[in-house]
């Protein structure tokens, strides 16, 4: 505690420094023994002295249940590709620490005498499908660079293709790495027949959001911080309840597939956040589920050589949802 702040009650001190909680909340934390002064619990809302050392011993948060089953699709002893279930966070963040794929991998492989496979990239919590991991740091670095290079080259190639009105199939195919996603979107909204492809070049930028301050959504591309983004969307199947699409992305922007589908008037079926136009609903958050999005196919050239082509074995929760809905 610095001299100008001496004499304040502890609750006033904390409420002024940490505005996420009011004074009454800090008084409750004092009573619970969470605040320590000079190595001892400060159970009363005492006035502070200059030089006091305060520690807030925050209790661990409660993490909700997540699906903990995942299938290993490929493993060569270094590179590992898994089929991540929807609802499982990949890395600790946003209130998730132990109930994450990273922690599951650490617990599964700890004590096995080999390096632990660790994720090379992210998938959204409610995105299922293929996730690339690697045991050796140099392999993770190589794969991460390969993914970045294919994304950057794909974005440049998509822009060039758009300028001449063709070449959408090149999106996501550059640099020896290709990723394809599948998703359910609201029915009848796309100006496509099955098998036809649409190139989407809507920019993505941060805009005001009442809950989060700012959030990523569709943008004009004219404001500072707006990011160029490109996706190639192909309509695969139509049904009265939902349409099945395949998407290749040439830029790894936040929530890109959700935003781009919504931007062209075909939001992901069940997406509570992004509606037609690609703007964010004020009452929803990015981590809210309900949509069906899958990292379906992966093509890459591993450091060991050769070509690796994998598809998610769960043939899409999308198809399961169609069956459950009586399609």
Task: Label each residue range with its predicted role.
Residues 1-327:
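RNA pseudouridine synthases
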């Amino acid at each position: 505690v610095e001299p100008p702040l001496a004499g304040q009650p502890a609750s006033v001190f904390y409420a002024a420094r940490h505005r996420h909680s009011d004074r009454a909340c800090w008084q409750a934390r004092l009573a619970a023994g969470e605040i320590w002064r000079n190595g001892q619990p400060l159970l009363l809302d005492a006035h502070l002295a200059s030089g006091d050392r305060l520690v807030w011993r925050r209790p661990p948060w409660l993490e909700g249940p997540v699906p903990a089953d995942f299938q290993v699709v490929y493993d060569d002893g270094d590179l590992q590709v898994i089929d991540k279930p929807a609802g499982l966070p990949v890395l600790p963040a946003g209130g998730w620490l132990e109930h994450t794929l990273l922690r599951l991998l650490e617990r599964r492989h700890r004590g096995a005498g080999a390096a632990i496979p660790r994720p090379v990239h992210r998938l959204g919590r409610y995105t299922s499908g293929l996730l690339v991991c690697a045991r050796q740091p140099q392999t993770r670095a190589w794969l991460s660079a390969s993914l970045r290079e294919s994304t950057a080259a794909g974005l440049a190639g998509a822009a060039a293709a758009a300028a001449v009105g063709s070449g959408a199939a090149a999106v996501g195919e550059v640099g020896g790495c290709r990723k394809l996603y599948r998703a359910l979107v609201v029915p009848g909204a796309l100006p496509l027949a099955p098998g036809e492809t649409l190139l989407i070049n809507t920019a993505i930028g941060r805009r005001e959001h009442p809950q989060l301050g700012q959030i990523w959504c569709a943008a004009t591309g004219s404001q500072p911080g707006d990011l160029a983004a490109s996706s190639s969307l192909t309509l695969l199947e139509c049904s009265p309840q939902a349409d099945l699409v395949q998407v290749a992305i040439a830029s790894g922007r936040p929530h890109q597939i959700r935003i781009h589908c919504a931007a062209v008037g075909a939001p992901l079926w069940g997406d509570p956040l992004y509606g037609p136009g690609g703007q964010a609903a004020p009452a929803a958050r990015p981590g809210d589920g309900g949509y069906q999005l899958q990292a379906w196919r992966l093509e890459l050239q591993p450091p060991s050589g050769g070509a690796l082509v994998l598809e998610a074995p769960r043939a899409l929760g999308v198809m399961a949802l169609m069956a459950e809905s009586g399609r």
